[in-house]
């Protein structure tokens, strides 16, 4: 029985280490950290003396394009007090969404930053282990390595770990020795776990493995292509019928003396560069389609697409976006519950419910279409002039927008008075000119 238990523990430990390796690779590809190191083993050491390894980064662009929920942001309505506490939330949530798309599952700690003006901060954690009670999808505790100041050459201390549950925080060294144990009064685990999609048979959801796999293939193919181009340009010297050894120097400034009957030639591989390029395009387009994206290459050109054509082309991605809205609305509720509990422990009361409105990205409209759309919304009382001005200039507050509109109306009314006077003058001028002409005729 102990043998079975030990085997299960070893398997779980192995799976945890493999997951950490996958997360590290995902983060490296997104950040562009030594991406060449992942394909270096595919080539012999002598290749590195010929060309540098290709380090193309399509992962970051794909992940950023897939993350649309917080592209523009979200409007949260829970009172002025909550608005002040969450000044950083929209910016942090944009990054959290991207990292969730990349890693599959991340943990975000909700931090109460005290000071003259307290506020929430949100710190994502990528490498972590969770503990459960009865529900395998609801963690009750978490442990993770504490980030060290690795850029500080004077810091050589051991790695520290943090442990959190609903009652206490524990700091440990890498040997498991407790450094500090501090109780807290939150009454809740101060972490929110976000997943790129709904969980199936495990707490963790896999990340963007297909994207980094395609990225790896692209880097290998591009490196091979550059290596082939080098050999095609310079070729490989080949000599027959002469016993001169392999260390002969060749070049345009070198004369070789060959014995009678020997031959000297330069051969080059017959690889098709265009086929390699088409294969790279196929890989990129395939992974893009699998993630509801489409790729347009620079040489395709063509007319600038209209908003309607973009909507039709992007229909599948729009449906996927609507599915994600429901998921992230649930995560926003989870964040708010944790925020509310933490605020209560510091004597701050927040409303029971959070009003939330995700600001959806819009497709471009022509000027005429935009004018008609704005006029329709004003006539149907879907928006007022203040809200419309704030859409065009979101740096304005409602009070500033209201003052701007009142000032513009007053100025336009004055201009309209002068315009009416000018038009009246233009109407009377031809009549007066005709009378003057008749007088001149009578005098003659």
Question: What do the PLM-derived regions correspond to, one by one?
Answer:
Residues 18, 33, 73, 89-92, ...:
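Short secondary-structure junctions and interdomain/linker hinges
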Residues 101, 107-200:
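Extended, regular secondary-structure scaffolds
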Residues 1-118, 435-436, 440-444:
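Extended, helix-rich architectural segments
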Residues 30, 42, 46, 51, ...:
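Generic structural signal for hydrophobic core residues of well-folded globular domains
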Residues 2-3, 251-270, 274-288, 309-444:
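C-terminal anchoring/interaction modules
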Residues 2-41, 149-152, 204-225, 247-273, ...:
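Short, charge-rich amphipathic segments
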Residues 178-312, 316, 349, 359, ...:
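Extended, charged amphipathic alpha-helical segments
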Residues 26, 42, 160, 169-171, ...:
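Polar/charged side chains located within well-ordered beta-strands of beta-rich proteins
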